[in-house]
A protein has these predicted regions:
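Structural detector for short beta-strands of small beta-barrel domains
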Residues: 1-9
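Helix-rich effector regions associated with P-loop NTPase G domains
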Residues: 11, 28, 34-50, 58-75, ...
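SH3/SH3-like beta-barrel fold
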Residues: 13-17, 24, 45
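A short macromolecule-binding patch
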Residues: 21-28, 53
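Charged helix-capping and loop-helix junction motifs
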Residues: 90-93
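Canonical P-loop GTPase G-domain recognition
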Residues: 111-162
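Conserved active-site beta-strand-loop modules that form the wall/rim of enzyme catalytic pockets
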Residues: 153-156, 161, 165-169, 196-198, ...
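A conserved segment at the C-terminal end of the G1
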Residues: 164-180
Length: 292
């Protein structure tokens, strides 16, 4: 029987199957292989001694360690246009990590009823990243988010104060109740806020990821310097066009990326983020690279 993990607590995993949610444990072989099942994993269940066990884990598209979730399709990066002041560097780090993992980042601008979103809009208008402005008064932007959710596994990332909870409540007024209902069904009560829980909505799935509420970009993933240029999709048309092979797009002459920047075809703030991220990893040796 096949399904996907909706939650994992204390060595037990809860798998959504056509027959409902099944409590199970993984086979010991996974521990020997140093593989830990996580929410979002597509799995195959078998019965041993009358109990269900996870027998196979399908190959993952991607996996995040903090919080533990696999096979994400979309990561909504929630940012406020007022307080707290949005950090484009943090947003760019998270979006780059998402792209590097094969996840589509979507910038979501909240609190737009309090202030115009010109700062964020101008920072991302020349990027290829989708940008959604939310207006709770008119409901603008909510349908667009629902369209992104349809047919996909999504998560929301945003630090405290950016309005992530308000956004989720506007999208899913019953989400807290549904998450609680899942917890009650799993017999774990309400003290499960640290675990990832996946539930279905709008024809897709949403991973309730408390760890993304205070996510530290530097702990979310590591992109080596040779891959960093690919994590900024708007650089794509200019890659391979530079005068020198292995161009870092920072100081070299004949750099096509810098030329595009000078001609106004790329965002200065996005380019500055790229340079800052490059400087952080340029001297990191292979053996020093963190594992995620």
């Amino acid at each position: 029987m096949n399904g996907y993990i909706v939650k994992g607590i204390g060595g037990f995993y809860y798998v959504k199957t056509p027959d409902g949610i099944v409590e199970c444990k993984p086979r010991g072989i996974f521990r020997k292989q140093k593989i830990t099942p996580v929410a979002g994993d597509e799995v195959t269940l078998e019965t041993e001694n009358g109990a269900s066990v996870i027998a196979q884990i399908a190959p993952r598209k991607n996996v995040f360690v903090r919080p533990p979730v696999a096979n994400l399709d979309v990561l909504f990066l929630v940012a406020s246009t007022t307080q707290p002041t949005p950090s484009t560097l943090v947003l760019d780090k998270l979006s780059a990590i998402a792209v590097d993992k094969g996840v589509q980042p979507v910038i979501v601008c909240t609190k737009s009823d309090l202030a115009e979103a010109e700062f964020l809009r101008s920072a991302y208008e020349k990027s290829t990243l989708p940008f959604i402005r939310i207006d709770y008064g008119s409901g603008a932007g909510l349908d667009e988010i629902k369209q992104w959710i349809s047919g996909r596994l999504c998560a929301f990332c945003g630090n405290s104060g950016v309005g992530k909870s308000t956004l989720l409540n506007a999208l899913l007024p019953d989400a807290a109740r549904e998450t609680s209902a899942i917890s009650q069904k799993l017999g774990r009560g309400r003290h499960t806020t640290r675990e990832v829980t996946i539930f279905e909505a709008f024809g897709g799935r949403i991973a309730d990821t408390p760890g993304f509420a205070s996510l530290e970009a530097n702990r979310a993933g590591f992109i080596p310097k040779e891959n960093l240029e690919h994590a900024f999709p708007e650089f794509g048309p200019y890659l391979g066009q530079c005068q020198f092979t292995g161009c870092s797009h920072r100081t070299e002459k004949g750099c096509a990326v810098r030329q595009a920047l000078a001609e106004g075809r790329l965002s200065q703030t996005r380019y500055d983020s790229y340079c800052a991220m490059y400087d952080e990893v340029k001297d990191v040796k292979d053996w020093q690279r963190p594992k995620f």
